[in-house]
């Protein structure tokens, strides 16, 4: 019998109690950003409108750098891949992800299930500090409120969203320097990544020794078919998430289980923190 923490408290927005959002200039000054092609350090180009590794250039959109591999962006039409047969395995992969993300992927931000989850996630993350990378950040101005004020925040998302600064790129190919982050966050995003093992490997790569991977996800007990799900690649069982983290050499430090905020009995909310020891 799975035991759950009892908690009916909901998240309350408070912009005064937020992590500090780093800017593009901050990221460049600290040498954090890397080319997704060469993994060389990125700097502003001479025209200050692009980033460059000295050979390849990367555009920005609303001051957010577009750090997809050039193999992908060279095939874009209006910022997306056309739904045509692709011979490249990378283009096939990105096209599958693009198709999956065309529907509504989250409960409304102010719905009770969303607010229950955000409170639980916020409580789970209370001990974090340093620079955190939010993989699949969605809305950074809201996401920063989930983390302690002593944190500095960078978000990465495959899409440009509302125009707030974030890195536009893939969690499976993080354009981030190795050993530079204090935490990597997957807040209900890991199940949207087809190759979630590679995404976790990338998270471990960019973490400093002692850094944390935080995963919040549904864990399924039954009815886990994907044949009726148009937006997720995975309906994880708990052992899949724990096994993936431990398989990468991480140590589980904290694990919390809550009843599904949508009151389903075939799944529950799982919150896990794991640390990098070497």
Predicted regions and their residues:
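Short catalytic micro-motifs in class I SAM-dependent methyltransferases
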Residues: 188-189
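Conserved class I S-adenosyl-L-methionine
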Residues: 214-242
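A conserved beta-strand element that flanks and buttresses the S-adenosyl-L-methionine
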Residues: 185
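N-terminal, positively charged/glycine-rich alpha-helical extensions of SAM-dependent methyltransferases
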Residues: 4-103
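A short glycine-rich, Lys/Arg-flanked "PGG" loop and its adjoining helix->strand segment in the class I
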Residues: 197-212
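Class I SAM-dependent methyltransferase SAM/SAH-binding core
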Residues: 130-173
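Conserved alpha-helix/loop element of class I SAM-dependent methyltransferases that forms part
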Residues: 104-130
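Core SAM-dependent methyltransferase catalytic element
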Residues: 248, 254-278
């Amino acid at each position: 019998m799975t035991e759950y923490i009892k908690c009916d408290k909901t998240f309350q927005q408070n912009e005064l109690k937020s992590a500090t959002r780093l800017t593009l200039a901050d990221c460049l000054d600290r040498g954090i950003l890397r080319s997704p092609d060469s993994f060389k350090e990125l700097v502003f180009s001479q025209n200050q409108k692009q980033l460059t590794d000295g050979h390849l250039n990367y555009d920005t959109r609303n001051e957010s750098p577009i750090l997809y591999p050039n193999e992908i962006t060279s095939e874009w039409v209006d910022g997306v891949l056309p739904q045509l047969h692709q011979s490249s395995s990378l283009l096939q992969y990105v096209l599958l992800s693009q198709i999956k993300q065309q529907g509504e992927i989250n409960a409304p931000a102010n719905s009770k299930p969303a607010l229950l989850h955000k409170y639980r996630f916020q409580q789970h993350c209370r001990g974090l500090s340093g620079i955190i990378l939010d993989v699949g950040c969605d809305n950074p101005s809201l996401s920063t409120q989930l983390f302690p004020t002593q944190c500095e925040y960078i978000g990465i998302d495959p899409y440009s969203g509302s125009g707030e600064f974030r890195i536009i790129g893939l969690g499976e190919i993080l354009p981030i320097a190795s050993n530079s982050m204090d935490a990597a966050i997957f807040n209900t995003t890991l199940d949207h990544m087809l190759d979630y093992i590679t995404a976790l490997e990338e998270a471990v790569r960019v973490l400093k020794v002692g850094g944390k991977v935080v995963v919040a996800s549904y864990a399924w007990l039954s009815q886990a078919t994907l044949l009726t799900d148009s937006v997720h690649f995975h309906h994880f069982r708990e052992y899949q998430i724990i096994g993936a983290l431990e398989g990468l050499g991480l140590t589980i430090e904290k694990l919390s289980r809550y009843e599904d905020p949508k009151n389903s009995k075939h799944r529950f909310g799982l919150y896990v923190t794991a640390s990098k020891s070497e």
